[in-house]
A protein has these predicted regions:
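Active-site proximal loop and beta-alpha junction motif in alpha/beta enzyme cores
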Residues: 1-80, 86-294
Length: 294
């Protein structure tokens, strides 16, 4: 890079800098190539960072509130990232005010609304059209072996499925909170399974009550052992929960993530009757700027 681009750092899905999932945000990535953006993401070391540029023609949205957004992990570009979307929306909300935003992502168009809530900003993203699919028994067995999870440790009420709401995630439900807490997996073996199935994370879930869940997301394909708060997976899980009849057509779910990592986060998932898309919301806070490039 020949010019300096300010790299903002925000944590998403928590108002506490020590909680949630940190993301890099570059509000003006014009002039940056793919290698530049990957280098910034790798230098930061966060699970993903977001890079904004001018919107494509015909995207819609209010002038100055529509953008092209690309997401990079330390290892590769990803089609969509929920927590970096929330972080970006909070950063924009602080600069251009609350209201509606429109993001053009590789996964599709993602509307985001930023609102004020008790003095804090809250961002709500609406996913692209979600869907779920079965996973082959052999692929499931390989994923469980990589996790060192015996099949009897799964919750039979929540069957394994691959869920998509911008990125693909394998949903596996633990029968107990203890099972969820005990996570020591084979990084390379799980990464190989995930690459073969084109998965972004494996979403490990434990159901505390009707609408409250605890989740963990291994992310070896991004070069990260575990993601502290995964908005894209939360959206995919909302679609999964509705499709298998776990929750009604209209529901609000609370997902607790990051607790076992010491970075607690809260993700709110909203399902609306008559709308197959999923809304994922959370707060965020700035961690401080740094510079990238020379």
């Amino acid at each position: 890079m020949t010019t300096k681009h300010e790299v903002l750092r925000y944590t998403a899905f928590s108002g506490d800098p020590e909680g949630g999932n940190p993301a890099g945000v570059v509000l003006d990535a014009s002039g940056l190539g793919d290698a530049d953006m990957l280098s910034v993401a790798a230098d930061l070391g966060y699970s993903e960072s977001a890079f904004l540029s001018a919107p494509p023609e015909g995207l819609g949205g209010e002038a100055g509130r529509a953008f092209t957004v690309r997401y990079f992990s330390p290892k590769a570009e990803v089609p969509f990232c929920g927590h970096a979307t929330v972080a970006t929306a909070i950063a924009l909300g602080e600069r251009i005010g609350t209201g509606d935003l429109v993001f053009a992502t590789r996964a599709g168009t993602v509307p985001v609304t930023v609102s004020g809530e008790s003095g804090a900003l809250r961002a709500t993203l609406t996913t692209v059209e979600p869907h779920t699919e079965d996973i082959a028994d052999t692929d499931l067995a390989e994923a469980l072996a990589a996790l060192d999870w015996p099949a009897p440790d799964l919750d039979p009420a929540l069957p394994p499925r691959i869920a998509f709401a911008g990125a693909r995630h394998l949903v596996l439900a633990a029968a107990t909170r203890k099972r969820l807490a005990d996570l020591a997996y084979d990084f390379e073996r799980l990464e190989a399974v995930m690459r073969r199935l084109d998965l972004t994370t494996v979403q490990l879930v434990w159901r505390e009550s009707a609408n409250v869940f605890h989740v963990r997301d291994p992310f070896p394909v991004g070069g990260v052992v575990e993601d502290p708060a995964t908005g894209a997976a939360a959206g995919a899980f909302g679609a999964y929960a509705r499709e298998i009849g776990l929750v009604p057509e209209a529901a609000v779910l609370t997902l607790h993530q990051g607790e076992d990592m010491g970075r607690p986060a809260v993700l709110t998932v909203e399902l609306r009757e008559g709308d197959t898309r999923v809304r994922v919301s959370g707060t965020g806070t700035r961690l401080g700027p740094q510079q990238a490039g020379s």
